[in-house]
């Protein structure tokens, strides 16, 4: 490709409304342009990267035995009514009516459509197992689209759905998809971690997320320092204390604490060890019989709402009770709450169950109890894992301790079981002629999100540093003053021809432009390898080569450059 015949569209200035580096660089590099909130057009450079990501995803899915199909983005509402998600999904589901007043949605996901398709097309166990995938546009009406392609309303996704009659083949397909996702991200040259994850609104049993590691990642990953164990912070298991509860050494006493509205203030004013304090959080209960529930964690720990959501007593999704409700039921406000004398159900974290001589609110404004001990002062409450893990704690496999990293979720695989097939009556006849409900798996990759995540992991102060496999161009040719030198023009044109014939994606900057601008554009759009051609190089019989990632420069003899670049591009 010649720059003179290409829509390069680079920008010097960083757009004011772009918060994260991938959004900034995708705009500056001329990859995307905003049409409306969360909606973008891909320009040629962006589309080249997107198509390369898409190609790798497609190749690995095909290798894993999945079969490509294509389903409509517009979906009839009655399918969503069947599964109950018409009411449950919320405002992210964009709903509309056609000219005949029939309800439709813009698909944020395709479980309903694929299940409807399979129940009509598959009738016998002989047709199973089956794994179908598509690469299709999705739409989620995010309340606040931000971060460019990291959280846009319209995005490109690969979603696959598998169908089974037995758990064994479902497990085999799940493992195949796990390996395929690992291969996809490895081929793209990205540092990533597969992590245990919560199934979220889609539902199901086993689930893994695939995270590209980046400091800007929205998700916190807890991983083992001594094994492959890793989990989303929402899913990471807290260790059950092995040490017995300490004996009581203090008397229970009621203390005036008028200026201690938070744990931090309490600890500072009374010189307490924060691990000897607890936080009492009041959430909405799951039934009229238990309208409020108290969740108690240690003062230095944080409540894990995903874990709390799974408690039978707690309403789903977890909702913090209002101060008015709390005062009406307990008689005190947040900041003065604790377990003694509490007239609502209590669930405490494992770490709280082994505490002794601890401090908590007295359920009277501006008062706390110090020296609280279980059994002596109150019975031990229901115990559960309801907190986030912290660095340094032992991991559940016993092979290391927790460390933390930030990640960007780009893939998610689920074992759905019968969540959708049962509600939609998707059945087949088994070997005995008996009707059986299908087991399902679901496997998603954010194709357009990978593009942004790759940038978040690969950039410097000059621009993007693309991994080889997904770069828009592998080689950039920079001829110095080619419009004034026939020698430079001839050699640049010959190299351009040779690289094209070798099947290497090459961009020739044939503009009448200053060298500084040419260099800046090549580095901004992240071309991995650049070759500089000038009269001085020609006189010396060498090309000047520069590696974008390392910054290394080399003089390569004319007759060796083509082989050198072929090897460099292969990595």
Curated annotation (Swiss-Prot):
One of its GO terms (molecular function) is proline-tRNA ligase activity. GO terms for biological process: prolyl-tRNA aminoacylation. InterPro entries: aa-tRNA-synt_IIb, aa-tRNA-synth_II, aa-tRNA-synth_II/BPL/LPL, Anticodon-bd, Anticodon-bd_dom_sf, Pro-tRNA-ligase_IIa, Pro-tRNA-synth_IIa_bac-type, Pro-tRNA-Synthase_IIa_type1. The keyword Ligase applies. Keywords: Aminoacyl-tRNA synthetase, ATP-binding, Cytoplasm, Ligase, Nucleotide-binding, Protein biosynthesis. Its EC number is 6.1.1.15. It catalyses: tRNA(Pro) + L-proline + ATP = L-prolyl-tRNA(Pro) + AMP + diphosphate. It comes from the Bacteria. It holds the Pfam family tRNA-synt_2b. GO terms for cellular component: cytosol. It is found in: Cytoplasm. Disulfide bonds: none annotated. Its main location: cytoplasm. Homodimer. Catalyzes the attachment of proline to tRNA(Pro) in a two-step reaction: proline is first activated by ATP to form Pro-AMP and then transferred to the acceptor end of tRNA(Pro). As ProRS can inadvertently accommodate and process non-cognate amino acids such as alanine and cysteine, to avoid such errors it has two additional distinct editing activities against alanine. One activity is designated as 'pretransfer' editing and involves the tRNA(Pro)-independent hydrolysis of activated Ala-AMP. Belongs to the class-II aminoacyl-tRNA synthetase family. ProS type 1 subfamily. NCBIfam families: PRK09194.1 (NF006625), proS_fam_II (TIGR00409). PANTHER family: MITOCHONDRIAL RIBOSOME PROTEIN L39/PROLYL-TRNA LIGASE FAMILY MEMBER (PTHR42753), PROLINE--TRNA LIGASE (PTHR42753:SF2). Consists of three domains: the N-terminal catalytic domain, the editing domain and the C-terminal anticodon-binding domain. This is Proline--tRNA ligase. The lineage of its organism: Bacteria, Pseudomonadati, Pseudomonadota, Gammaproteobacteria, Alteromonadales.
């Amino acid at each position: 490709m010649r720059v003179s015949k290409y829509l390069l569209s680079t920008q010097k200035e960083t757009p004011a409304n772009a918060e994260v580096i991938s959004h900034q660089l995708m705009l500056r590099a001329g990859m995307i342009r905003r049409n409306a909130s969360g909606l973008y057009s891909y320009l040629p450079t962006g589309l080249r990267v997107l198509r390369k990501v898409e190609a790798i995803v497609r190749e690995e899915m095909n290798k894993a035995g999945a079969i490509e199909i294509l389903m409509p983005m517009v979906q009839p509402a009655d399918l969503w009514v069947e599964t109950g998600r018409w009411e449950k999904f919320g405002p992210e589901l964009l709903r509309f009516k056609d000219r005949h007043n029939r309800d439709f949605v813009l698909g944020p996901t395709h479980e309903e459509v694929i299940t409807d398709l399979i129940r009509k097309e598959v009738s016998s166990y002989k047709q199973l197992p089956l794994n179908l995938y598509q690469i299709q546009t999705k739409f989620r009406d995010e309340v606040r689209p931000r971060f460019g392609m990291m959280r846009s309303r319209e995005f490109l996704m690969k979603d696959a759905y598998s169908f089974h009659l037995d758990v064994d083949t479902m497990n085999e397909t799940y493992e195949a998809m796990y390996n395929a996702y690992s291969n996809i991200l490895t081929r793209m040259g990205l540092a990533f971690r597969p992590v245990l994850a919560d199934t979220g609104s889609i539902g199901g049993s086993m689930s893994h997320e695939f995270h590209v590691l980046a400091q800007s990642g929205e998700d916190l990953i807890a991983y083992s320092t001594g094994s492959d164990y890793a989990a989303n912070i929402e899913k990471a298991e807290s260790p059950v204390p092995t040490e017995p509860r300490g004996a009581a050494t203090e008397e229970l006493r009621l203390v005036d604490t008028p200026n201690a509205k938070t744990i931090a203030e309490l600890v500072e004013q009374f010189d307490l060890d924060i691990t000897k304090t607890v936080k009492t959080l009041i959430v909405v209960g799951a039934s009229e019989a238990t309208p409020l529930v108290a969740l108690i964690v240690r003062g230095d720990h944080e409540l894990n709402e995903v874990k709390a959501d799974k408690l039978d007593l707690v309403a789903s999704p977890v909702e913090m009770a209002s101060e008015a409700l709390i005062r009406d039921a307990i008689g005190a406000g947040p900041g003065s709450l604790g377990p003694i004398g509490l007239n609502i159900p209590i669930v405490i974290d494992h770490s709280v169950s082994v505490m002794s001589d601890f401090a908590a609110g007295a359920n009277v404004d501006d008062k706390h109890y110090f020296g609280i001990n279980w059994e002596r002062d109150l019975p031990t409450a229901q115990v559960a894992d309801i907190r986030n893990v912290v660095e340094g704690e032992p991991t559940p496999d016993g092979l290391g301790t927790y460390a933390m990293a930030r990640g960007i979720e780009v893939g998610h695989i689920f074992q759905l079981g019968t969540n959708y097939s049962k509600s939609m009556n998707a059945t087949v006849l088994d070997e005995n002629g008996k009707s059986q409900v299908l087991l399902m798996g679901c496997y998603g990759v954010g194709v357009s999100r990978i593009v942004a995540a790759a940038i978040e992991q690969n950039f410097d102060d000059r621009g993007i540093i693309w991994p080889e496999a997904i770069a828009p161009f592998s080689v950039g040719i920079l001829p110095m003053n080619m419009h004034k030198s026939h020698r430079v023009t001839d050699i640049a044109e010959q190299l351009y021809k040779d690289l094209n014939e070798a099947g290497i994606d090459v961009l020739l900057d044939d503009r009448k432009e200053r060298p500084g601008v040419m260099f800046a554009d090549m580095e901004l759009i992240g071309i991995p390898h650049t070759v500089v051609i000038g009269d001085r190089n020609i006189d010396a019989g060498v090309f000047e080569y520069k590696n974008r990632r390392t910054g290394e420069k080399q003089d390569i003899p004319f007759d060796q450059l083509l082989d050198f670049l072929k090897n460099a591009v292969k990595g």
